[in-house]
């Protein structure tokens, strides 16, 4: 024996998650387009709420996030009793995996799905089965083919990060219909507020019509609250009961809850941000394509630019950094030839487009 505390082997089966960078050495003004944060920051009402609640930061928050759940219910016409809030949606994702997975069981996801699913699953001792995709979009038939008697959870990010692709509601419904009833389907709709397609459903209808589906959402993107960490899940009552047993007692801070309630009440915020995102995304995609690079279709607040080779993507990233611009390399997702670029303000989008145009002319 070593005489030292020993962690479970599963802890060392995954590398630590690395988020988008925020700083560059020697650069005072950084344009951060690496974490899919909202272009305009938090709504003014949320900022005011954070300031106001600071005076009572010594008080423990409501452990059940009652007022926040009621506000979410009002905004999205949902039953607050079927809502669970957490310290970001990844908190709830990890709780679902801990609660329904375990050693020897399996989680199914698409090939380029969100990394947190695999990390949390492996930490829980699960095996991860990744289904091949079609044109960087989840292939429902391929996902169903990966399901075995050991499968306990199926995760689908819709729209997906980092590709931005979307699976129509009819296909998601078919996925659920063909899963065994004891397999939990988790629909991660972190980017739902950005979608304008009529054939999209974030998961509400499937949660309402069955007992094995959960929808997760976040305040980190459209509502600009990534720094306070706030997410929520909509689920059948039996799953809500499980999450309330496994989550920590105060997993939503008072400031986070106050900011979330205020953000939901901000008049016109979602419409303003969505309209900007749709227009700016279209314009930036066109400029990147004119610079000579492929851009994959996106329904989220980011674009995936294809530089064809890993070396070229790395060179482009270095060039952008020299201009004070941080985007996201996505080699960890199996896409070393790509860069993920958040849709920022008009000025930020113009700056990154100019830099990529210059790279294309001088390094193409």
Curated annotation (Swiss-Prot):
Quaternary assembly: Homodimer.
UniProt feature coiled coil, ranges: none
Pfam families referenced in this protein's UniProt entry, alphabetically: Aminotran_1_2 (PF00155)
Cofactor(s) the record lists: pyridoxal 5'-phosphate
Classification via SUPFAM superfamilies: PLP-dependent transferases
UniProt similarity note: Belongs to the class-II pyridoxal-phosphate-dependent aminotransferase family. Histidinol-phosphate aminotransferase subfamily.
InterPro entries: Aminotransferase_I/II_large, HisP_aminotrans, HistidinolP_aminotransfase, PyrdxlP-dep_Trfase, PyrdxlP-dep_Trfase_major, PyrdxlP-dep_Trfase_small
Organism: Acidiphilium cryptum (strain JF-5)
Keywords: Amino-acid biosynthesis, Aminotransferase, Histidine biosynthesis, Pyridoxal phosphate, Transferase
Pathway: Amino-acid biosynthesis; L-histidine biosynthesis; L-histidine from 5-phospho-alpha-D-ribose 1-diphosphate: step 7/9
Entries under PANTHER family matching the protein: HISTIDINOL-PHOSPHATE AMINOTRANSFERASE, HISTIDINOL-PHOSPHATE AMINOTRANSFERASE 2
E.C. numbers: 2.6.1.9
A GO term for molecular function: histidinol-phosphate transaminase activity
TM segment ranges: none
Name of the protein in its database record: Histidinol-phosphate aminotransferase
GO biological process: L-histidine biosynthetic process
């Amino acid at each position: 024996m070593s005489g030292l505390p020993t962690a479970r082997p599963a802890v060392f089966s995954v590398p630590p998650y690395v988020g988008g960078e925020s700083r560059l050495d020697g650069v005072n003004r950084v344009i951060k387009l690496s974490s899919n944060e909202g272009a305009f920051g938090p709504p003014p009402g949320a900022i005011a709420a954070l300031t106001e609640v600071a005076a009572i930061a010594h008080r423990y928050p409501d452990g059940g996030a009652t007022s926040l759940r009621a506000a979410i219910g009002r905004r999205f016409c949902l039953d607050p009793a079927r809502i669970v809030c957490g310290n970001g949606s990844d908190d709830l994702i990890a709780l679902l995996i801990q609660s329904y997975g375990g050693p020897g069981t399996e989680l199914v996801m698409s090939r380029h799905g969100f990394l947190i699913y695999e990390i949390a699953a492996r930490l829980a001792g699960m095996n991860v089965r990744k289904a091949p995709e079609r044109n960087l979009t989840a292939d429902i038939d391929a996902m169903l083919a990966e399901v075995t008697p050991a499968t306990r959870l199926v995760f689908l990010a819709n729209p997906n990060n980092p590709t931005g692709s979307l699976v129509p509601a009819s296909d998601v419904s078919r996925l659920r219909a063909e899963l065994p009833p004891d397999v939990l389907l988790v629909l991660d709709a972190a980017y739902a507020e950005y979608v304008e397609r009529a054939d999209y459903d974030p998961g509400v209808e499937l949660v309402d019509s069955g007992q094995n589906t959960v929808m997760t959402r976040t305040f980190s993107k459209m509502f600009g609250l990534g720094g306070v960490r706030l997410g929520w899940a909509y689920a059948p009552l039996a799953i809500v009961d499980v999450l309330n047993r496994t989550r920590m007692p105060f997993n939503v801070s008072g400031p986070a809850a106050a900011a979330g309630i205020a953000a939901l009440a901000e008049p016109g915020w979602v419409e303003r941000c969505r309209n900007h995102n749709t227009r700016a995304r279209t314009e930036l995609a066109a400029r990147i394509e004119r610079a000579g690079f492929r851009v994959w279709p996106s329904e989220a607040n980011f674009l995936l630019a294809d530089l064809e080779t890993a070396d070229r993507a790395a060179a482009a990233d270095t060039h952008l950094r020299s201009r004070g611009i941080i985007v996201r390399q996505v080699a960890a997702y199996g896409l070393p030839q790509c860069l993920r670029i958040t849709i920022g303000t008009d000025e930020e989008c113009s700056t990154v487009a100019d830099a990529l145009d210059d790279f294309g002319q001088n390094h193409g």
